[in-house]
Amino acid sequence: MTLEWNIDDKFHLFFRKKRSVYIVGGVHHDEDEVDPKVVAQSGLQGDDGVVRLPPLNTLVNFLGHVSPYMHADYAFLHREWEYNRTASFADDLVNLPSVYDWRYVYPRDDEETKRKKRYIMPPDNQYLCGSCWAVSTASAIGDAYVVAGLVDWRPDISPAWALTCYPQGQCEGGSPALLLKEISQGNGIVSNHCLDYSFCASNPRCNGAAANHFGAENLSELVPKSCGCYVGDSMHYRYTVDPLIRTLAIGVGTVTEENIQSTIKRHILTHGPVLAGYFVLKNFTSGYFTRINGGVYFDRGNYIPGQALVFNDHYCSGDSYRGSHAVAIIGWGVARNVLYDTDKRGDVPYWYCRNSWRSTWGGDDGYFKMAMYPWNRVAQFEKLVTLRDRDNVPHRCGGIITFTVSTKPVKVKMNQLNTTLLPFPLLRDRSWYGGDQEEYRPAIVPKLAPSDGPNKPPLPLPVYYSALDLALLVLPALLIVIVVLIGKIPT
């Protein structure tokens, strides 16, 4: 149960102007007041004291690069289900579980599935580079290898390799669909042991928490200029993906509102996380929504610390547009008895997503819940939508990408970069880059899922008033009572 205490009367607004409002964890990236302690806790504040957010992708476009989902693809997925009938999900061929994800362990999971969940990637950090398209794709490829049983370790796939060898817009954005296609047709992709994110993570120009109001410079010039590893003549695993890469979006191909969500769920259960694109709005960026109302993001919510949660179309209009973003969907669930409109409650289905704004973003260790379509109609995954920004420029986003892997990674000798020309120090000792560590098996044991799916403890009650505030509020009432009592004293 989530506790909420909203005080929006005139007295509160008066006192709010006089002192900061303390909300645990919520960070507001507008002109509104926030407590400095909250900003510090958020992980979004750079060493210079400036609150920053990652630059958002303007090139997330899943159309035109890969084919839409068709009847043959449903048949293929059905055959995969049939093949896995002896697995722990066999009884869900028709009835899918209402809650499932690759982060937590559920009672239905067998020992093999529990072991695989140890190797699923946690949220990464793209820093100031607009590389969500590369970071989310790299993590999903590694997950796919784990779920397919092709590796018995965490692959730790390299986003830097994607930015270098399949550059697209590099730090200005790109399409996960096109990246997957190029990986399947090219020379694959390697792990961070070959080429990691040092170009950004160890460079002061890039390793801030993100750009203030998304006003980051284009940092593509920092990306290595040619494919290769930091250490030459070293053996590294090369991973690839199958050519079967598909777009899922309502109204595209044979995808409908009736079949899209069940198809996505079955793919996640069978093959692992999928990739999704969506519009990021002003009310999303702070991650404050992850801490209230079941943690589900509704694009019509205000999500302003210190104010009652209300819903209005203004919050998902073009004036609120911030950019487009790509993330991995790792599961789904149902939030029980949450507000989905002003003064309206109910059970709302959501997608459980892994962001790339580091694990300190939001209140769920870098993960978040996105209300499914049609609960959200602008910031959502299932439908391609067009949104015009405040300058009347149209933007199009939405859709989900599915893919599969079926070939074990192969160790190959890689070329060496000229590290003397690199404008940054490496994150780790040189020996770490000397070859892949297939024995990389994190000791972290996945936690049991809460009964209602991924959730965080409720927020402590926000502290809006000091003792002086309360005294000033109560004093007038006491004076009135005293006057009334004096008036009743017999003369």
Swiss-Prot record:
The active site is at residues 132, 325, 355. It is a single-pass membrane protein. GO terms for cellular component: membrane. The keyword Transmembrane helix applies. Gene3D superfamilies: Cysteine proteinases. Keywords: Hydrolase, Membrane, Protease, Thiol protease, Transmembrane, Transmembrane helix. It holds the Pfam family Peptidase_C1. Its EC number is 3.4.22.-. InterPro entries: Papain-like_cys_pep_sf, Pept_cys_AS, Pept_his_AS, Peptidase_C1A, Peptidase_C1A_C. It is found in: Membrane. The chain crosses the membrane at residues 467-487. One of its GO terms (biological process) is proteolysis. The keyword Protease applies. It is an enzyme of class 3 (hydrolase). GO terms for molecular function: cysteine-type peptidase activity. Belongs to the peptidase C1 family. Probable cysteine protease. This is Probable cysteine proteinase 024R. It comes from Invertebrate iridescent virus 3 (IIV-3). The lineage of its organism: Viruses, Varidnaviria, Bamfordvirae, Nucleocytoviricota, Megaviricetes.
